[in-house]
Amino acid sequence: MDLSNLKPAEGSVRKNSKRIGRGEGSGKGGTATRGHKGAKSRSGYSKKIGFEGGQMPLQRRVPKFGFTNRNRKVYQGINLDTLQNLVDEGRIKDTVDMDVLVENGLAGRNELVKILGRGELKAKLKISVHKFTASAKEAIEAAGGEVVTL
């Protein structure tokens, strides 16, 4: 092996591709691989998104339906098992109101809250929030707690 017969490893060197549109001498001048005439050969050409060659596009063939209710109220759901975990950790004492929920990161200051019935509640709590499911209300009262709707 000499310096005269060294060559790079197989596949380690890539031949640079020809740059298009750089004069006839480059081998890719003239039409620069775009063919002759027509919209696709012009600068600035791009197909419109959803264009189907003049056929009525899908988004116009499919009918409109439904609407968005602007007056919809969105409630932040909190389950009973979440409240029970906080009681077990000592982060909730005997009353649960918006201040306590915000403090513990369960709801935002301006959010509406709904207590949901998943899990089991053993603690006797006075809970005052915006809404309760029937099963949650039952479980809270069965544990000796109190339900207050804001």
Swiss-Prot record:
Pfam families: Ribosomal_L27A (PF00828)
Entry keyword annotation includes Ribosomal protein: yes
MF terms in GO: rRNA binding; structural constituent of ribosome
Listed SUPFAM superfamilies: Ribosomal proteins L15p and L18e
Top-level division of the source organism's lineage: Bacteria
GO biological process: translation
UniProt keyword Flavoprotein present: no
UniProt keywords, alphabetically: Ribonucleoprotein, Ribosomal protein, RNA-binding, rRNA-binding
InterPro entries: Ribosomal_uL15 (IPR030878), Ribosomal_uL15/eL18 (IPR021131), Ribosomal_uL15/eL18_sf (IPR036227), Ribosomal_uL15_bac-type (IPR005749), Ribosomal_uL15_CS (IPR001196)
Segments for region (Disordered): 1-52
Residues that span the membrane, as ranges: none
Positions in coiled-coil regions: none
Residue ranges, compositional bias (Gly residues): 23-32
Entry GO terms, CC: cytosolic large ribosomal subunit
Subunit structure: Part of the 50S ribosomal subunit.
Purpose: Binds to the 23S rRNA.
Similarity section: Belongs to the universal ribosomal protein uL15 family.
Designated name of the protein: Large ribosomal subunit protein uL15
Source organism: Christiangramia forsetii (strain DSM 17595 / CGMCC 1.15422 / KT0803) (Gramella forsetii)
Chain's gene name: rplO
